Design a protein with these regions (language model features):
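Transmembrane beta-strand segments that form the barrel wall of outer-membrane beta-barrel proteins
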Residues: 188-203, 228
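Short loop/turn motifs that connect adjacent beta-strands in outer-membrane beta-barrel proteins
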Residues: 22-27, 132-142, 185-189, 219
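Extracellular/periplasm-exposed beta-strand and loop segments of Gram-negative cell-envelope proteins
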Residues: 40-66, 88-122, 152-171, 199-200, ...
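Solvent-exposed loop/turn segments connecting transmembrane beta-strands
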Residues: 137, 172, 196-207
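Residues on the lipid-exposed face of transmembrane beta-strands in outer-membrane beta-barrel proteins
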Residues: 32, 71-77, 125-129, 147-149, ...
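Predominantly the C-terminal beta-signal and adjacent terminal strand-loop region
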Residues: 204, 208-255
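Short glycine/proline- and aromatic-enriched beta-strand/turn motifs that initiate or cap beta-hairpins
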Residues: 23-89, 251, 255
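Hydrophobic, lipid-facing positions within transmembrane beta-strands of outer-membrane proteins
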Residues: 28, 67-71, 121-125, 143, ...
């Protein structure tokens, strides 16, 4: 009798875990974000057997901060979530050189007026599995592990009256990380954080963000926080780069 009772309780627990609404709950949504980062970066591009100059992009070329708009879509089922994100980085500057610069095999002399551009698309494909996903009426907590690929697809260009040269950049970055979310006030207010990164063979990357989000009405979420992204690589042929973006962001999410 006791064995039958324990067996029945065990079956009931399994049914509750695997067939509860949260185990197979569907969710999807799309968001638009606006990031206002400070930018710092160094770049060296070799070419034609000539070692390039290590360029401070702000001081040497006059490249300034630019805000970055992005879009994101996600789909989730139970504890699994897939996210695709896209943003476009367009940086430019113009300056009369006070030092000689060698870039991609070409030489830009002192007193040359150089216009420069750094343009790249950032595409993120991310999978998150929620190890902990606790919800009740007034509060909730989730914690997950993340696997992600960030892909940079762009170019950097220097143009003067005598030379015009461009180097393409194609860089896929595999990353791993964690994400956490704390929900308060019946999911009206949430605190969220996420960090991913990877380091290997002298390369190092990370992308981290934290924000507060408010859901004033169903399906609509307004959020704001801080994001930092760092890229250091010499794995692209003839390109050596260190780039740092950090600053606040705001966004709007519609979810179902």
């Amino acid at each position: 009798m006791k064995k039958n009772l324990f067996a029945a309780l065990g079956i009931l627990m399994l049914v509750t875990i695997f067939f509860s609404p949260s185990a197979f709950a569907l969710g999807f949504g799309a968001s638009a974000d606006y990031w206002i980062p400070t930018f710092e970066g160094d770049l060296r591009v070799d070419g034609n057997g000539v070692t390039g100059t290590e360029i401070n992009l702000k001081d040497d070329l006059g490249i300034s901060n630019e805000n970055i708009a992005g879009a994101e879509a996600y789909f989730g089922i139970g504890n699994h979530e897939i996210t695709v994100a896209y943003s476009q980085v367009n940086l430019s500057g113009a300056k009369t050189l006070n030092t000689e610069i060698k870039f991609n095999g070409e030489t830009y002399d002192v007193a040359d007026h150089v216009e420069s551009e750094l343009n790249t698309s950032m595409i993120d494909l991310e999978y998150q599995y929620k190890l902990l996903n606790f919800k009740n009426i007034l509060a909730g907590l989730s914690f997950g592990i993340i696997a992600k690929v960030k892909y940079f697809d762009g170019d950097v260009r220097l143009n003067s009256s005598s030379d015009d040269t461009k180097e393409d950049i194609h860089l896929p970055i595999p990353m791993i990380g964690v994400g956490a979310k704390i929900s308060l006030l019946a999911n009206i207010l949430e605190a969220r954080a996420k960090v991913t990164g990877m380091g290997y063979s002298g390369d190092f990357f990370y992308d981290a963000m934290a924000d507060l989000s408010l859901t004033p009405i169903p399906f609509l979420n307004i959020h704001g926080g801080y994001r930092a992204m760092y890229v250091k690589t010499d794995s692209i042929s003839d390109v050596y780069a260190k780039m740092d973006f950090y600053g606040p962001y705001v966004g709007l999410l519609i979810s179902f």
